[in-house]
Amino acid sequence: MTLIHPTAVIDPKAELDSSVKVGAYTVIGPNVQIGANTEIGPHAVINGHTSIGENNRIFQFASLGEIPQDKKYRDEPTRLIIGNGNTIREFTTFNLGTVTGIGETRIGDDNWIMAYCHLAHDCVVGNHTIFANNASLAGHVTIGDYVVLGGYTLVFQFCRIGDYAMTAFAAGVHKDVPPYFMASGYRAEPAGLNSEGMRRNGFTAEQISAVKDVYKTLYHRGIPFEEAKADILRRAETQAELAVFRDFFAQSARGIIR
């Protein structure tokens, strides 16, 4: 059985595993690498220095590896790296990195990215995330593991969303969202704990209670932020579910949602 449709345009220099399926009228550039059992639908465009792993499914009209929407970009050989087992739906756009950033845009494994989502230059997306339709990341955004972005969520440049966090429909994320927390609103504010997401991912009632107490410490006890942060970091030394807050606080550049 022929796995590449005869109307697809694939540069001879592109490296595709023999098991890759390519649909009609798809265009693949010379610096593209695609791993085993990845399936690409019709009318997709994959360009730039782009590496795609195994067992991905890329739907029609996706645009992956085009140049960043950054006026400073001067055709440097920056990269887009996509892991394994991702579902990338219709009309998604993933841009290359920039030399003023980390030089690459990275997407991990087992992510579910719905139609019309946009990942700008130098974004880093973890594993097992869900992006609902039209969620968009500006440049230099970091998304942790098991994050859920509601439809039409917009994330500002350099923001960070921690593991297991969730945003509501049309949230405008302008500051960092701590792990496990929910955010909602045009200028996103804290909206409680993603306790259902935690339960679905195997957290115990005791662990959820510990994280809930962190939420109360940050937002409901009237404690200055630095004092609350120090208290949470102390608890993280003995409570494994709080360990993610160490890296999150250390790497947070924009401050957290309040």
UniProtKB/Swiss-Prot annotation:
Mind listing the GO molecular function terms for this protein?
A: acyl-[acyl-carrier-protein]-UDP-N-acetylglucosamine O-acyltransferase activity
Location(s), subcellular: Cytoplasm
Reactions listed under catalytic activity: a (3R)-hydroxyacyl-[ACP] + UDP-N-acetyl-alpha-D-glucosamine = a UDP-3-O-[(3R)-3-hydroxyacyl]-N-acetyl-alpha-D-glucosamine + holo-[ACP]
Quick one: which pathway?
Answer: Glycolipid biosynthesis; lipid IV(A) biosynthesis; lipid IV(A) from (3R)-3-hydroxytetradecanoyl-[acyl-carrier-protein] and UDP-N-acetyl-alpha-D-glucosamine: step 1/6
Q: What is its EC number?
A: 2.3.1.129
* The keyword Amino-acid biosynthesis is annotated on this UniProt entry: no
Q: What domain of life does the UniProt record list for this protein's source?
A: Bacteria
| Keywords of the record | Acyltransferase, Cytoplasm, Lipid A biosynthesis, Lipid biosynthesis, Lipid metabolism, Repeat, Transferase
What top-tier enzyme class does this entry carry? transferase
Keyword Metal-binding in annotation: no
Q: What is its main location?
A: cytoplasm
* InterPro entries in the cross-refs: Acetyltransf_C, Acetyltransf_C_sf, Hexapep, Lipid_A_LpxA, Trimer_LpxA-like_sf
Q: Which family does it belong to?
A: Belongs to the transferase hexapeptide repeat family. LpxA subfamily.
Q: Which HAMAP family match?
A: LpxA (MF_00387)
Its quaternary structure?
Homotrimer.
Put simply, this protein is called Acyl-[acyl-carrier-protein]--UDP-N-acetylglucosamine O-acyltransferase
Source species, please? Neisseria meningitidis serogroup C (strain 053442)
Its gene is: lpxA
